[in-house]
From Swiss-Prot:
Keywords: Auxin signaling pathway, Membrane, Transmembrane, Transmembrane helix, Transport. GO terms for biological process: auxin export across the plasma membrane; auxin polar transport; auxin-activated signaling pathway. May act as a component of the auxin efflux carrier. This is Probable auxin efflux carrier component 5b. It holds the Pfam family Mem_trans. GO terms for cellular component: cell periphery; endoplasmic reticulum; plasma membrane. It is a multi-pass membrane protein. It is found in: Membrane. Belongs to the auxin efflux carrier (TC 2.A.69.1) family. It comes from Oryza sativa subsp. japonica (Rice). The chain crosses the membrane at residues 7-27, 39-59, 71-91, 114-134, 145-165, 227-247, 251-271, 286-306, 312-332, 347-367. GO terms for molecular function: auxin efflux transmembrane transporter activity; identical protein binding; protein homodimerization activity.
Amino acid sequence: MIGWGDVYKVVAAMAPLYFALGLGYGSVRWWRLFTADQCDAVNRLVACFAVPFFAFDFAARIDPFALSYRVLAADALSKLAVALALAACAAAASTRCCGSGGGKRGGGGGFSWCITGFSLATLNNTLVVGVPLLDAMYGKWARDLIVQISVVQTIVYFPLLLLAFEVRRATTAAAAPPPPPTGTDDDDVEDGAAAAATAAAARRSLWPLVRAVWLKVARNPNVYAGVLGVAWACVTNRWHVETPSIIEGSVLIMSKTGVGLSMFSMGLFMALQDKIIVCGAGLTVLGMALRFVAGPAATAVGAFALGLRGDLLRLAIIQAALPQSITTFVFAKEYGLHAEILSTAVIFGTLASLPVLIVYYIVLGFIR
């Protein structure tokens, strides 16, 4: 049975996060302490230093030889179920579009919505919000599990999301009509057609996509911070090597800024927007439904199917209801795909997550 003391622990863990977010919001919206360029500099500091050190610190503390494979498999199964459901919806929409004369318009749009829907339903803020929250709810073992999920999300699912974005970009470029020929000579026309066919074939080849995704992943500090953290965890747990105190202290001094600066940066981002809801009420409701209902429901099915029960089942469901990952908005903005929807999901979802997560915590407390 969940008591008020347990609820207070959750609120006490979340309140400092909202305090940092409120300071960031007020420093721009009310006190005018930062300009837009200075906000970009703060965001850059967070993205390149604070969060990567935070991710490395927690990844280096896990035991790679004692991973909870059932929890990770349940998470993967739920993501696969969401991807298949979105693909089925896109195929059905494309079929209806073709049947009504919509033709080509349905396919590309369907794939775009699959990417956005997958981001909304499955990719959440596991590290910044999840670690302190689940530590308060269930203790150290829950914190260790959420770090495992976060590391897998960083080094597996984010690169896959980048791959999907690059595939969409390549297919969109390949589908673009070639420029009209400048001359009327038959040989010129044939040469132009051959060149267009060659260019299209090159665009469709796999290697440019793999290379583009690899470069994006290699430039992402969070990815190689997670990989380096796991590598160091393998060394320390395999050969029982202690991290030198000088290195541990150097990492910790930056890692401790990760949560606070991330929430502060999110507050800066919120203050720079004209309004919290920028994509309309309908899409906002859809995004919140995917974030707080569809994602946890898919995770519950996957976790139950793999035999998770008790606190493991509760943790799996609650981590799926965490706020939207900020990284998904960064990718959406970079690739120009529904950035306004992801922006609303990050801002409004973060504000709404506290009562939603408390409700999940209380309701799941009755499940045995």
